[in-house]
Amino acid sequence: MSGARRHRLRRELGSIGIALVLAWAPCLAAADDDQPPSAGEPDNPFYALDTKNLFGFLEGADVGEKGDRSLEFETTGSFGEAEGLYRSIEQEFIFEPTLTDSLGMEFGAHVLGQDVQRVPGLPDFAGVNFMGASVEFRYVVIHRTAEAPIQVTLTAEPEWNSIAEAGQSAADFSTTFRAVADVVSSDRRLYGAVNLAYAPDGARLPGQPLQDTSILSASAALSWRFTPPLMFGAEADYDRAYGGLVPREFDGQAVYLGPTFHYQVNEKIDLSAAFLVQAPAGRLDFDQFPRELAKLRLEVQF
């Protein structure tokens, strides 16, 4: 890639970073003025946490309380292909209202920055583009209680994208259907979650026929609170790629393993992150799935 193109990419990614800092700074500054969340019981400093963002790439089952509103800034990185250089960073800006104690929604706008060089089947590209938009519906079907600390939530997330890999124009429509279950220990120190997902996708590049694909995935995570605001954990994801909206022709699979992190800054602000690496499960598949995945998320309630 030429020096001019690299400079342009750094400038565009830098502009995104500056915008994020400006957006986050007032929220983080407000952390000094807010009181930390209070414990549920006088003898237990481990107060209740919203589980939705505790588990890295997995989702927790909480949707919040009626009337809650929040903004999320979610950065997802994908790195590495079988050959060449592949780096992709997606920035999502999310508005999340809770309509009832059982129903929540998310409205997202997506920006994509990519640096792709010498990857077979893809043109060389470096740049940043507006990618698309999404809506997520979250509905709790089984609520957590003191007697049964398990919660189950069903989600559906339709998404439209106008940009494909390597900056190619596309008309891409997908929907991710997810079953989410999580459990919290009685002392609120150990958290676990399981996600099952089905994601059909239909995409058309200019001058090419419609391509129908789908992904089935199963994920699990465990997290432990070392202090009331600080949590570390581990995540395992198993993904299978197929041709067809209804899984038909098997195209590849990947197992990802890695650590997760969550920090409750104060009652209204939390920060979470995860880093996953494709682990040996037979042959490593870098054709359908990247080598590494990373996520950083900031949520601000208001």
Model-derived regions: residue spans:
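Cleavable N-terminal export/targeting peptides
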Residues: M1-Y47
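Transmembrane beta-barrel domains of Gram-negative outer membranes and organellar outer membranes
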Residues: A31-F302
